[in-house]
Amino acid sequence: MQVVSVKKYKGSSYEVVFNDDRQIYLHIDIITDYGVRAGREFDEKTLDEIIYASNKRRAFQYALYLLDYRDYSYREMYTKLEKTYKNEDLCFEVMDKLVSIGCINDKRYAAMLAKRYVEIKKFGIYRAKNEMYQRGIRGETAENALEPYYDMIEENIALLLEKKYSRYLT
C-alpha cells in the first residue's frame, strides 16, 4: 500500500491516508520511527507492525493516564487494558514495561491497601484480605502486607464497640 498523504490531526497525532482510502491515526514518534511519508510503499506485514506499535504506545499512555489518579495492581491494570485493546500480547508487553519502570508494584499497593483498610476503615483482617483479593492482590502478598496489623485488631474492635454501643454500656 502506498501512503497518499500525511496530515496533522490533533495534538501530536497525524492522519495517514493510503491509496485504498484506508486511513489510520499515528503519533509523530511512530511516524518518525517507521519513516511514514507521502509516496512511501508499505507491505501488509510492515503496516501491521506500525499499527501494533501505535496501539502499544496508546495502551502505555492510557495506563500512565490511569495511574495518574490512583495505584493499580497488576491484575486490575491488565484487565482494564485487555477490555480496551483486546490483545493479550500487547497488554503483557505494556504491563512488563510498567513493572520494569516501577509504576506497577503489587507489594507497595498491598501495603497501601492494608493500611487503608485496617487503620482507616477499621476492617478486620479477613475483610481486608477479601477486599485486597477483589483488587487483585492475592495470597502471600496480601498476607505479608497485613502482617503488621494483626495486633491492631483488638484496638479496632474496642473502638468499634465504644463507637456503636457506648450508649448501652453506661
Feature-to-residue mapping (PLM):
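An alpha-helical, amphipathic repeat domain used for nucleic-acid recognition
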Residues: 1-170
